[in-house]
Structures are given as structure tokens and as C-alpha cells.
């Protein structure tokens, strides 16, 4: 399978995110706790792709030293359950907790004719995702990010199912990484002070 990968992202965001990631890599202790929640997607996205989207999100966040997903046995209550013990443990460890969800906003898949002179058909796949984080236990919106990616690959009829699955995984992984980079960058930025508040401080 020959693959041509392209990713659509704002250059400024990508550059800033890479700088941020390099800076945070030296952090010794995590600052955030996360739980991944069910992937949101339309009927055009099959269960296998949704399952991989959750795996990709979890793997991406777990690879970042400032994020943790395990703070001890029995302290991982899900939304709708009693999360008082989880909230207390997060406060004790000085961690900010978030429920993180992937939403697959758009998903397009198209089989194209072979290139001139070629024999293999081409599979084109595009996806746009958003990653949203809400606070634990308040469930208030804390951050979000978007990512968009696509792949066009030559596929053999005999391996169509396997090649389609692999293309889908690559698209999801790349789009989610973009979205998480953007979301984490926003989370790291200091909160802006309202204009009225800044004026009061100057007068004081």
C-alpha cells in the first residue's frame, strides 16, 4: 500500500504547540488527571474506528508527562457516579481533573480509480475531530481543540479491509494529535484578566 499523507492545521498553532511540548517535557510531576469518555460520532463511523479513536486519545495524553490517568485503585469514578473520593484525591495531589471526549465532526471515505498507468485503486479518507475537556467534578468546559487530516492510498483488492482499517487509524491518530496539541496549548495559557479588573488594579 502506497500512502500519501497530508494534514491540515494552522502553522502558528503547530509551531506554538511544538514549543510548548518541548518545554513541558522537562516537567517531573503531572499537573493534570484525565478520563477518556465515549467517542461521539455519526452512523457513518463504525465501532472499530470509534474504539481506535478512544485508544489514540488515551495514548496521546498518556505520553505527555504532565498528564496522568492512574491515581490509585478504586479512585476512578465515572460521570454519573459518586466522584467525591476522586475529587478529594485530585485536591490532595494538586491535580486538575478533566473528562476528555473526542467528537468526530466529519468523516469522508471515497474509492477512486487508479492513477494513469496504475493498476491499484486509491482510497481517500478525510476526518475532522474535536477534543473537549470538562472539569472534574463540576463538568464545566475547560478546553477544546480541533484537528483535521486525510490520507490517499493505493489499495489492493485482496487486502481492502485491512488497508482501509490501517488508513482509518492513521487519519484518526494524526487528527487527534493536532486537536490535543491545540487543546493542551490553550489550557497552558494564562487566563485573561477582564478589562474592568485590570483597570481597577492600575487605579489601586
Q: Which residues does each predicted region cover?
A:
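Positively charged n-region of N-terminal signal peptides that target proteins for export
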Residues: 1-7
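A structural "domain/chain start" motif
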Residues: 17-76, 146-148, 156-157, 161, ...
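Short regulatory "switch" loops immediately downstream of catalytic or recognition motifs
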Residues: 65-69, 106-112, 153-155
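A short, well-structured beta->alpha microelement
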Residues: 70-90
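Surface-exposed short loop/turn segments
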Residues: 83-140
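Short secondary-structure boundary motifs at beta->alpha junctions and helix caps
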Residues: 118-186
Amino acid at each position: 500500500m502506497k500512502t500519501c499523507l497530508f494534514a491540515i492545521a494552522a502553522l502558528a498553532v503547530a509551531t506554538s504547540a511544538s514549543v510548548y511540548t518541548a518545554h513541558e517535557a522537562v516537567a517531573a510531576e503531572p499537573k493534570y488527571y484525565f478520563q477518556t469518555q465515549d467517542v461521539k460520532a455519526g452512523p457513518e463511523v463504525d465501532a472499530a474506528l470509534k474504539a481506535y479513536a478512544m485508544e489514540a486519545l488515551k495514548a496521546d495524553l498518556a505520553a505527555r508527562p504532565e498528564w496522568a490517568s492512574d491515581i490509585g485503585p478504586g479512585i476512578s469514578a465515572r460521570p454519573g457516579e459518586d466522584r467525591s473520593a476522586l475529587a478529594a484525591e485530585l485536591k490532595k495531589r494538586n491535580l486538575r481533573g478533566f473528562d476528555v471526549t473526542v467528537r468526530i465532526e466529519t468523516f469522508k471515505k471515497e474509492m477512486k480509480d487508479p492513477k494513469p498507468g496504475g493498476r491499484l485503486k486509491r482510497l481517500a479518507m478525510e476526518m475532522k475531530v474535536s477534543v473537549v475537556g470538562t472539569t472534574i467534578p463540576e463538568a464545566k468546559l475547560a478546553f477544546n481543540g480541533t484537528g483535521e487530516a486525510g490520507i490517499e492510498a493505493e489499495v489492493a483488492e485482496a487486502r481492502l479491509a485491512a488497508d482501509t482499517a490501517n488508513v482509518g487509524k492513521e487519519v484518526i491518530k494524526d487528527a487527534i494529535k493536532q486537536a490535543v496539541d491545540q487543546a493542551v496549548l490553550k489550557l497552558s495559557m494564562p487566563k485573561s484578566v477582564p478589562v474592568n479588573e485590570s483597570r481597577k488594579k492600575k487605579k489601586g
